[in-house]
Structure formats: C-alpha cells, structure tokens
Amino acid sequence: MITKFRIDESVAQEEFGLACQRLIPWPTDADSPEDPPLGAMACFLRPGGSSQPDCHNQDEFMLILSGTGTLDLDGESTSFEKGDLLVLPRNQEHVVHNGSDDENLVWVSLYWPLREVPLS
C-alpha cells in the first residue's frame, strides 16, 4: 500500500515556537496496529524567527527544503541552506534560526525512535 503526504503549512500546528505538520505517525488501521519505527514532521519557521530550545532522547535528521538559517546545537553553531541535511544527535539541546527577513524556512525532520526511550 502506498501512503502519500503533501507538505501543507495551512494544516500545521504551533509547536516548539514554529508551525509543525505531523506526517508520521499517521492513523493506523486495524490491519496495521504497529507504530512506524520513526516520526516525521514538516516545519515552517517565519522570517527572522527562532524555535524554542528543544532536547529529546531521539536522533533527528533535518532536510532543508527552502530558506537559509543557523542551527545552534549544544554550544556549536552552523549555517545551512536549501538542500542541506543536518544530523542532530539525541540528548543535545538545539535551536533553529531563520536567517531570512522575507522567506519562511521550511524543513522536514525525521526522528527515531518514534517514542522517546526513558533515560535510565
């Protein structure tokens, strides 16, 4: 079965100081009760905006679809642009900044495991 999504800011919800459209997990049916192994969301950050600081026990990839920005990750900073793929290791605080005054920053985040594993 093919499952198709469309990235659409109009259905995004406010989370983490930006607009997020949850893509995965999707509603499961009776034939597929298991959670997928990862989560995904499209993120939209307004011009000049910054996300709230976030830290979670999940690894994350950010694929930049449009715009430019800066990622602050556990005391380190790097700039990025459309087409870049950023790797965020688990348990490291991060903040995303939109470097444009007139263009939304848009990316897709993939994170795993789907549910955070409790720290021992």
Where are these regions (language model features)?
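Conserved short histidine dyad/triad with adjacent acidic residue
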Residues: 24-29, 41-56
